[in-house]
Regions:
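Extended active-site neighborhood of metal-dependent phosphoesterases/phosphodiesterases
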Residues: 16, 24-40, 98-243
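Acidic, histidine-bearing metal-coordination/catalytic regions of metal-dependent phosphoesterases
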Residues: 1-55, 60, 77
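Active-site loop signature of alpha/beta-hydrolase-fold enzymes
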Residues: 44, 62, 91, 152-153, ...
Length: 245
């Protein structure tokens, strides 16, 4: 499948593997004559069994994300799943935010985008001068993400990524529930339109948001306006609320 809602062509390949056994099934991916390392597919943990989950969020191509994921994976060892409550990337309709810099960026470019880090093929130099690669997680265990405000693009157009894009990929609503061993995961779409709470009289100098509270209301949350809102309603009677109850 070619995903057109990106700033460059992105292709998605999907395969279904059944009959997985407890010992796991080794696999590799071959594309354009290049073969990946060997990874492992395992069946879902049995209901009620103990599991080890890695919870992370707000990656957004930050300088130390690769180091954090590499060190966390080394410290906790093998996990059964990765849970991400939002903000996987910075700008969702930039392919580079998901897959890494364009090849034209050169061999020395920093690689600290979402998938390279979660696949252990990043190249991100931390403040200590050491280069970190992240960890090979999503090739071996499932990823359960939630949509954060950074996954919601602000402009709908022929080449922009939107909530519809995620539905096209998964075929599902942006909220879901799943059982992982002895854990019941309930994921809602409650991403919030973020706004700052600073006050600046000059609109051109407002770095975080063009909209702001009145000076007299900044210290009183009860008087704040509606510039900060949840993208998908969870009010009583809404589709998401009906599903949850």
């Amino acid at each position: 499948t070619r995903l057109t809602r990106m700033d460059r062509a992105v292709h998605r390949h999907r395969a279904r593997v059944g009959g997985l056994q407890a010992g796991g099934l080794g696999y590799r991916v071959i594309s354009d004559g290049q073969a990946s390392p060997r990874f492992t597919l395992r069946p879902a943990p049995g209901k009620g069994s103990g599991v080890r989950l890695l919870i992370t969020s707000d990656h957004q191509a930050k300088p130390h994300t690769a180091a954090n994921m590499e060190l966390a994976a080394a410290m906790v060892g093998p996990v059964d799943a990765v849970i991400m409550p939002g903000d996987l990337v910075n700008s969702p309709d930039r392919a580079a935010d998901w897959f890494g810099p364009h090849p034209s960026a050169g061999d020395d470019a920093e690689i600290r985008q979402f998938l390279p880090i979660m696949q252990g093929r990043a190249r991100s130099t931390a403040a200590n001068g050491r280069a970190y690669r992240g960890a090979p997680l999503v090739q071996n265990v499932p990823l359960y993400p939630a949509i954060g405000n950074h996954e919601v693009s602000g402009e709908l157009g022929p080449s922009s990524c939107s909530i519809d894009s995620y539905r096209q990929i998964t075929g599902a609503r942006p909220w879901y529930a799943v059982t992982i061993g002895n854990v019941r995961l309930i994921t809602l779409f409650v991403a919030r339109m973020w706004r700052g709470f600073d006050v600046n009289a000059d609109p051109r100098a407002r770095q975080r948001s063009r909209y702001q509270e009145a000076s007299a209301d900044v210290g009183d949350p009860q008087r704040h306006g509606q510039g900060c809102f949840i993208h998908e309603s969870i009010a009583p009677g809404s589709p998401q609320w009906q599903w949850l109850v």
